[in-house]
UniProtKB/Swiss-Prot annotation:
Residues 18-141 form the RNase III domain. It comes from Helicobacter pylori (strain G27). Mg(2+) binds at residues 54, 127, 130. Gene3D superfamilies: 3.30.160.20, Ribonuclease III domain (1.10.1520.10). Its cofactor is Mg(2+). Residues 168-237 form the DRBM domain. SUPFAM superfamilies: dsRNA-binding domain-like, RNase III domain-like. Keywords: Cytoplasm, Endonuclease, Hydrolase, Magnesium, Metal-binding, mRNA processing, Nuclease, RNA-binding, rRNA processing, rRNA-binding, tRNA processing. GO terms for biological process: mRNA processing; regulation of gene expression; rRNA processing; tRNA processing. This is Ribonuclease 3. It comes from the Bacteria.
Length: 239
């Protein structure tokens, strides 16, 4: 199953449809099949998809980003470092890094996901980013992943510190809705699936009994934060 968007891109070459992606990433895959697997969502119903690579990438990125923050923010205690890491090691954080290399343009998704703009969904895009980094790790090792992540953090964030990077979207939204509607948001679990070691939660956010957002995450807290982020954006656009 070929990616039509990639095929029609003016940057694609016949022998390597991922030339521009690899250039943006700063790494050229030796095994293009590994790259294709990292970009293939399970909705394609192919023999190989990116779920196993996503599992590995989650662990690799947690280590790499934790190490980078440990060395960069020597003045932060464990609590602050954990908050900072939580802002990056999340669907929202990885989506931001993925979009820095236009990863969404290269994903292989089913026609139904294409119609529903699946390639833009944080749950799909962030998972593909984790899988991509796992592929780099398998071929080139931890040092190469570390270099790529450092470059992407510099490109994706104007400032990398606790004040500007980590924002408690739930608190920010609650303050806004109390001021604007005299109510606080409520959250409802829509779906919980997957094995214990790889859970996925889908939450919905309501304001005055109206659904404002839904989001998925690896924990209820992450999904709620993502919902709050979407709701904040929607309320800002409505002003």
């Amino acid at each position: 199953m070929k990616n039509k968007r990639s095929q029609n891109s003016p940057y694609v070459t016949p022998n390597n449809p991922y030339t521009t992606l690899e250039k943006a990433l700063g790494y050229s895959f030796k095994d293009k099949r590994l790259l294709e697997q990292a970009l293939t969502h399970k909705s394609c119903k192919l023999a190989l998809n990116n779920e196993r690579l996503e599992f590995l990438g989650d662990a690799v990125l947690g280590l790499v980003i934790g190490e980078l923050l440990y060395h960069k923010f020597y003045q932060y205690d464990e609590g602050k470092l954990s908050k900072l890491r939580a802002a990056i090691v999340s669907a929202h954080g990885f989506t931001k890094l993925a979009k820095a290399i236009a990863l969404q343009d290269y994903l292989r998704v089913s026609s139904s996901e294409e119609i529903s703009k699946g390639r833009e969904k944080p749950s799909i895009l962030s998972s593909a980013f984790e899988a991509l980094m796992a592929g780099v790790y398998l071929e080139a090792g931890l040092a190469k992943v570390r270099k790529i992540i450092q470059n992407l953090l510099n490109r994706a964030y104007k400032r990398l510190d606790l004040e500007h990077l980590f924002m408690d979207y739930k608190t920010a939204l609650q303050e806004l809705t109390q001021a604007q509607f005299c109510v606080i948001p409520t959250y409802q679990l829509l779906q919980e699936k997957g094995p214990d070691h790889h859970k996925e939660f889908e939450m919905a956010l309501y304001i005055q009994d109206k659904m404002y957002a839904t989001a998925k995450g690896k924990s209820k807290k992450e999904a709620e934060q993502q919902c709050a982020y979407y709701a904040l954006q929607k309320l800002k656009e409505a002003k």
